[in-house]
Curated annotation (Swiss-Prot):
Keywords: Protein biosynthesis, Transferase. Attaches a formyl group to the free amino group of methionyl-tRNA(fMet). The formyl group appears to play a dual role in the initiator identity of N-formylmethionyl-tRNA by promoting its recognition by IF2 and preventing the misappropriation of this tRNA by the elongation apparatus. This is Methionyl-tRNA formyltransferase. (6S)-5,6,7,8-tetrahydrofolate binds at residues 109-112. It comes from the Bacteria. It catalyses: L-methionyl-tRNA(fMet) + (6R)-10-formyltetrahydrofolate = N-formyl-L-methionyl-tRNA(fMet) + (6S)-5,6,7,8-tetrahydrofolate + H(+). It is an enzyme of class 2 (transferase). It holds the Pfam family Formyl_trans_N. PANTHER family: METHIONYL-TRNA FORMYLTRANSFERASE, METHIONYL-TRNA FORMYLTRANSFERASE, MITOCHONDRIAL. One of its GO terms (molecular function) is methionyl-tRNA formyltransferase activity. Its EC number is 2.1.2.9.
Amino acid sequence: MKIVFMGTPDFAVPSFKKLIEEHEVKAVLTQPDKPKGRGKKLAYSPVKEEALKHDIPVYQPTKLKDDKEIIEKLKEINPDFIIVVAFGQILTKEVLDIPKYGCINLHASLLPMYRGAAPLNWVIIKGEKKSGNTTMLMDVGLDTGDMLLKEEVEIHEDMTSGELHDILMISGGELLLKTIEGLYNGSIKPIKQEGETFYAKMLDKELAHINWNDDAYDIHNLVRGLNPWPIAYTEYKGERMKLYKTKVLDKEVSNKPGTIIEVNKDGVKVVCGKNVLIIEKVQFPNGKPLTIEQYINGHSIDKDIILGE
């Protein structure tokens, strides 16, 4: 079948590759090249890099809704499907109406929960035990279209958003192929999104600042949910201390939240509003992420210091 693919980051690449293997991808739309690195050289998106390997035409509208030339090109292609995976732009009704069988979006959550830009992060920050991918028929709303297929994965207690990203990135391609086949042969019936929802808004760096009055479980979830970006942090003796790995000790302690009560090679124990957080991996300014065992081999972390002050 004739496909137009719209996607931008590395999350979209495995799905794109699956579509190339099984279908005829006639064109790719991706975000414009952006300055990257110290030299601020323009860098291609991961999807553009993959498209060029296969000599697939690439279009990079700043705003697709205003780009009449590209919209006319899409109409000329007359695709059976437009497939959207983390494209980064809203599609207008004019574009949604172009493909014969509709525009399908792969969204990295179990809709209707975690609509929005950062589902992989918020599902972990909120302490959920499962997540997954959903394919849906796109409409003019934000992640509000009728659902097609879902695939669940379990979230274990130490999983980071980066690890969840990598799992769903790989599994999404197969789900898209099943969705295309099912819509084509009529075996999939779209289902309206109903019930509880939570909007997974874009992350900001303010969210990453740890509040030690919170329950240790909530802080642990924040640390997992903000890894690999932007990384949860606190202050130790006025220096920013980023937390990469933690675990929770079910223990009530009367010290002020944020107080370091024990330091050994296994971690730094910190009092929280409820329970105790054990910090296992940190990064200080101008340093690399290190386990506590590695860090205290050449530096000190003092007991009784109150973090965040």
